[in-house]
Amino acid sequence: MSLLIIGGTGTLGRQVVLQALTKGYQVRCLVRNFRKANFLKEWGAELIYGDLSRPETIPPCLQGITAVIDTSTSRPSDLDTLKQVDWDGKCALIEAAQAANVKHFVFCSSQNVEQFLNIPLMEMKFGIETKLQQSNIPYTVFRLAGFYQGLIEQYAIPVLENLPILVTNENTCVSYMDTQDIAKFCLRSLQLPETKNRTFVLGGQKGWVSSEIINLCEQLAGQSAKVNKIPLFLLKLVSQIFGFFEWGQNISDRLAFAEILNVENDFSKSTFDLYKTFKVDDSEITQLDDYFLEYFIRLLKRLRDINFEDIQKQKNLII
């Protein structure tokens, strides 16, 4: 089976590429910058030039392709290119995939998209979901919450560097997941007919509130965090005020994203059925506390190695 992966240089996309190559798939990555994507070539993937903002570059990328996995997304602040890439480009991608007789299209969307159609990126993701459903391509849509990898920058690093952490005062559980595990589901969907033409809300086994993640980081780092709480109603008010001005639209959209993860999702009821459908055992899924523990262990080892090298350099200077 030959795969075309969109967004292969991203946090999730690179995991999909690596696991697909390990499993023996023929992997082709649509890229704009060959230099930036060179590590994918070193892994064994084929690189082909393609740009979602230039629809004419898409059809050649699909020649001989069995399945497409789209893990790409624009930054919500890039409004100039948002419609061009995440709507026009992805519509062109679906049409080209249909013309190329692609057998399966896997699309990574976001949780709660239908509840936040006032946010351009969410509106476009929901629109692409709908377009896939209306096409004749067998599809699988994964609605994702957050990645473990994003929590490192949001929580772990500020705790280690004694920087303030901004959180809302809402205690909403978010079922974060490791991108390596999400990649497993993406690839497994290609082998399971029962996952075709379905939309899955994909999350970890446990929901986490901000305070729990901060406490975990404090325990592992051995130091207290600086936490600044911002009421969600104030965040909404600021978002609405900025939204009145064209120059403030980017700020408004970024603030509005805080609301998305503050919609309660009870993954515990559906996780068992989801894992059963994809034939995934609980033990295969990395837990957040284990992920953070491994990160802190690696970091502390690196710091010890750096400290040892500095001591050796000082000794050499003395000698």
From Swiss-Prot:
GO biological process: photosynthesis
EC number(s) reported in the record: 1.-.-.-
Main EC class the enzyme belongs to: oxidoreductase
GO CC, alphabetical: chloroplast; photosystem II
GO molecular function: oxidoreductase activity
Keywords from the named record: Chloroplast, Oxidoreductase, Photosynthesis, Photosystem II, Plastid
UniProt cross-references to InterPro entries, sorted A to Z: HCF244-like, NAD(P)-bd_dom_sf, NmrA-like
Keyword Metal-binding recorded: no
Major place of residence: plastid
Protein family membership: Belongs to the NmrA-type oxidoreductase family. Ycf39 subfamily.
This protein's name: Photosystem II assembly factor Ycf39
Location(s) in or outside the cell: Plastid, Chloroplast
Task of the protein: Involved in assembly of photosystem II.
